[in-house]
Swiss-Prot record:
Keywords: Cytoplasm, Pentose shunt, Schiff base, Transferase. HAMAP family: Transaldolase_3b (MF_00494). It catalyses: D-sedoheptulose 7-phosphate + D-glyceraldehyde 3-phosphate = D-erythrose 4-phosphate + beta-D-fructose 6-phosphate. It is found in: Cytoplasm. Gene3D superfamilies: Aldolase class I. The active site is at residue 83. GO terms for cellular component: cytoplasm. Its EC number is 2.2.1.2. Pathway: Carbohydrate degradation; pentose phosphate pathway; D-glyceraldehyde 3-phosphate and beta-D-fructose 6-phosphate from D-ribose 5-phosphate and D-xylulose 5-phosphate (non-oxidative stage): step 2/3. This is Probable transaldolase. One of its GO terms (biological process) is pentose-phosphate shunt. The keyword Cytoplasm applies.
């Protein structure tokens, strides 16, 4: 499974990338607002940190305007992945951009039917939102299962990018089901390493080692 981080905070991205954990980055207008920086400036810096795809989202809702924004975003760096909304215009733009050799991420997916359309449009990634479905008492993982089955049935190459991930259990369940990628906030990715028995065991080993009076180096 690939790990993307869902943030526009350069400090967090650099830290996770230095750990060797990152395969890519996803951003959106809300994260750009939170970062408080110019979209071109911050996206260019992010692209210089990570080698994998960096999703940068168009804000236009009409096809021709989407294509204009996509052209501007694609000039930022070679690893830009154009993020598009799951609308008819977004799918049309996805098809055109993919045919022209660009990576695409079709976002705001909440149904298997929508994911099927994204795959038909040739999307590099489709982003089903787990947490937001959970918020309305719908099991977001059921959507991941349905998409996985459909894509496997027909051999679609579009990668399932599990988004709106809020807990370490979301990451685990997405991995068990077979999502290709998970994108999560920095804190969630860091929390994957935590287990109380790991901390307890390390504490015991260190205490016992101190009693030996030895040094390794």
């Amino acid at each position: 499974m690939k790990f993307f981080v869902d943030t526009a905070d350069v400090k967090d991205i650099r830290e996770l990338n230095d750990l060797g954990l990152l395969d890519g980055v996803t951003t959106n207008p809300s994260l750009i607002l939170k970062a408080g920086r110019d979209i071109v400036e911050v996206t260019k810096e992010i692209c210089s940190i990570v080698e994998g795809p960096v999703s940068a989202e168009v804000t236009a809702t009409e096809y021709s305007a989407m294509m204009k924004e996509a052209a501007a975003l694609s000039k930022i760096a070679d690893n830009i992945c154009i993020k598009l909304p799951l609308t008819l215009d977004g799918l049309k733009a996805c098809k055109a951009l993919t045919s022209d050799g660009h990576q695409t991420n079709v976002t705001l997916c909440f149904s298997a039917n929508q994911a099927l359309l994204a795959a038909k449009a040739g999307a590099t990634f489709v982003s089903p939102f787990i947490g937001r479905l959970d918020d309305i008492a719908v099991d977001g993982m059921d959507l991941i299962r349905e998409i996985r089955q459909i894509f496997d049935n027909y051999g679609y190459e579009t990668e399932i990018l599990a988004a709106s991930v809020r807990t370490v259990n979301h990451v685990k369940e997405a991995a068990l089901i077979g999502a290709d990628v998970v994108t999560a906030p920095p804190a969630t990715l860091k929390a994957l390493v935590k287990h109380p028995l790991t901390d307890k065991g390390l504490e015991m080993f260190l205490a016992d080692w101190a009693k030996t009076g030895q040094k390794i180096a």
